[in-house]
Amino acid sequence: MTTVPSTTTKVGIPGEGVAAVATTAPRRGPSIGKAFAWIVFVIAFLYFFLPLLGTFFHSIKTRPDIFLAYRQVLGDPKFFGGLLYSFVVGVITIIVSLAIIVPTAYWVRLKVPRMRPVVEFVTLMPFVLPPVVMVFGLIRVYSSKPLVLTGTNFGSDVLLVCAYVILSFPYMYRAVDTGLAAIDARTLTEAAQSLGSGWARVILRVIFPNIRTALLSGAFLTLAIVIGEYTIANFLARTAAFGPYLSLLGRNQPYQPAAVSLISFGLTWIAMVIIAGIGRGTRSRVQVAGAR
């Protein structure tokens, strides 16, 4: 630890001696807080990295061909089919969830702030309601007249997306609400309306660009949940979704599930990076303009 020598300042009137002496305390070198932050970072890194490393070592235990599990997984058409199906369902879920959550959170914050606790309580309901209860309720209600959806593939897909939208409410609403809290939504709205913009234009051209980071955060969480979800997809997916496929593979194969987990982990992160890149690439200055 390095120290800085103390300095002494003499204060007085010329010819009358020194009136006061001020001594500055020695300053410490490296901050203890910075060292503690690095320790926490290293512990967190090992906490997330070591399980991945252990999974990788387990996946290459196939002898003599250590990458046999990866070749078998990549050669299975059900792997890419299930992953693509879950990814598409996840993207649709994100779009529908944003279309519901963003206007709701914006209107509550702008017009009816007293309803905010009620909306927060409603968005937390998926944490209380188990997915198996939700899926059996959907099947029971929509398997009989007047609205039969479980009898067709399209109807089952619609129910699946609706269930995932409900599951995404806690994560998406928290992300959007945090983004709205970071901007002055009222001033932006008044400025846009003073230039002749309607509510739809304000939300699409003013609010959305200013909470882009929050929207991407909620989208990432939603996509990760949809791709790995098992219970609802097992009952409603018209084809083998990725979650049920991974569960079925784990019952019959010892090493392939580890390979699937690592491959899907990498592909999911690649998809998230692409989405983030698209969001940053399309970033533009907010234009507050009325109709001409």
Predicted regions and their residues:
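Glycine/proline-centered hinge or cleavage motifs at structural transition points of membrane proteins
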Residues: 195-196, 209
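Short glycine/proline-centered loop/turn elements that form peptide/ligand docking sites
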Residues: 184-188
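Alpha-helical transmembrane segments of bacterial inner-membrane membrane proteins
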Residues: 17-22, 26, 59, 64-76
